[in-house]
Amino acid sequence: IQVRMGSTRFPGKIMMKLDDKFTVLDYVIRQLGHSKLLENIIIATTNLEQDDIIVQYAKDNDLAYFRGEVLDVLDRYYQCAKKFSLDVIVRMTSDAPFLDPTVVDEAISKFQETGCDFVSNNIIRTYPIGIDTEVFSMEALEKTWNEAELPSEREHVTPFMKKNKEIFKLYNLENKKKIPIYRLTIDRKEDLEFLRAIADNIKKQPILMKDVYELFSQKPKILELYNDSMNLIEGYNKSLKDDEEFLKKMNKNSKKANFKSFKETIENN
């Protein structure tokens, strides 16, 4: 699970309480604890001092942890996977308190059955945001780590895999039921009231995706708290702008290198 205290829109969000006792991060860990196929839960956080609290949380909860790069999350995953000698990685984010362990297990099963390099339920989205599950091999992660260059590919870990179908064998896990795509993640302070209302109304563990949607059917007023004004891929769009700057710089450096080479050739002749 990639975890850090820093956030552009809502710093410290993962340590916000969803009920009287448990934080957002607690919910993530508890939900994943109900998976039948996950072997280990590892916290992948950063080397920043502000994330010392995450390390202490891992220690207090007897969880394995790793500290690495802040923005190069791909490197963080790769170094973490190497440290723990992982063959298969299931990638999760810590801002999704209602991750569904049955969906996680289905994705892992598909990975095992198909022999694919990468299995996900968000290549073509049919699941809510916040139920995202990505499973990939160490070989796929290592190839991505070696070849991915763009800032968006380094920060968001898996875009390089998704974009290169000729290199990786991909499988998209589709939801059999057609449902509205809501966002069940904490991205802004305004999301807290909505997520707390869900937690307050479903007193069971684990909270499954179907439980959340049944609640919306039974108590539609809860959806009045839903903030759908946010650009769902705001962070990724920012990375794409960084990609443009990166490519401009690369192009500029390439032109300089070509000119230098041309000049040296002329002088040598």
Segments and roles (model prediction):
Residues F10-H34:
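Short, well-formed alpha-helical segments that are part of the catalytic scaffolds
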Residues D26-D87:
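Conserved N-terminal catalytic core of the sugar/cofactor nucleotidyltransferase
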Residues L86, T133-W145, K189-E193:
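Conserved nucleotide-sugar donor-binding
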Residues V88-M92:
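Short aromatic-hydrophobic micro-motifs that form the base-stacking/packing surface
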Residues I131, E139-N164:
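Anionic-ligand binding region
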Residues F136, V157-N269:
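Conserved alpha/beta core of the MobA/IspD/sugar-nucleotide pyrophosphorylase nucleotidyltransferase superfamily
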